Amino acid sequence: MKILWLDLNSSYAHSSLALPALHAQVANNPSVTWEIVSATINENPGMTAGEVYRHHPDIVAATCWLFNHEVLMHVLSRVKALLPHCCITLGGPEFLGDNAAFLRRNPFVSCVFRGEGEEVVPQWLRVWNKPNAWEEITGLCYLDKDGNYHDNGLARVANFQSLTPPECSKLFNWSKPFVQLETTRGCFNTCAFCVSGGEKPVRSLPVETIRERIQTIHDHG
């Protein structure tokens, strides 16, 4: 199985933490091959789609944000036309609400994840080509072959502290001028404009774990 991660950002100064966060949880699975196509929203969507096509992936995955949403849809619609049998799956803050309208408006997208993916994406990869089994995957939203909408709720990581750190993934991007280190997930504030507002429970890593991970980053240089 070949997964193509489409890393579409506003500029090359940015790097998605979602890719290494997910890859780290399945890095030991020899049946899964990961490849990356990186692009910015300022590049030609047709050229980006062509680059994805050259990899001939089974699955195309990406994170959808406010700033890349429009261009991402242009790219993925072209990818589906070039690779009609590929499975396109998305995640990110754009899918925290009702996803029925989005899926009907963008039928080239096979499914979207609502919530946190580190535990449920590995489960889905075991049945990615068996849509009849998707109803068991928490957080997955999709349309079945008859066009019926299925909403499997919100996925939350049961044990935040037990996750394999993103920096353990070979796909972690060390080339940027800064490194992202997630020490807390969720927020106790309730800002109306923020998708993390009011997210409970707030989960934090132990100070000792944070210290060890900072040391790992330091040792990497």
Task: State where each predicted segment sits.
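N-terminal [4Fe-4S]-dependent radical SAM core
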Residues: 1, 137, 142-183
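Radical SAM [4Fe-4S] cluster-binding motif and immediate context
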Residues: 161-221
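Glycine-rich beta-alpha loop elements in corrinoid/cobalamin-binding modules
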Residues: 2, 25, 33-154
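A short, flexible N-terminal coil/short beta segment enriched in small residues
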Residues: 1-20, 24-25
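Tryptophan-centric aromatic hotspots in well-structured domains and transmembrane helices
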Residues: 12, 25, 67, 102, ...
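Secondary-structure boundary/capping motif
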Residues: 14-15, 68-71, 160, 167, ...
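Short amphipathic alpha-helical segment that frequently serves as the phosphate-/nucleotide-binding helix
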Residues: 16-23, 73-76, 211
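Core AdoMet radical
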Residues: 5-11, 39-40, 58-68, 92, ...
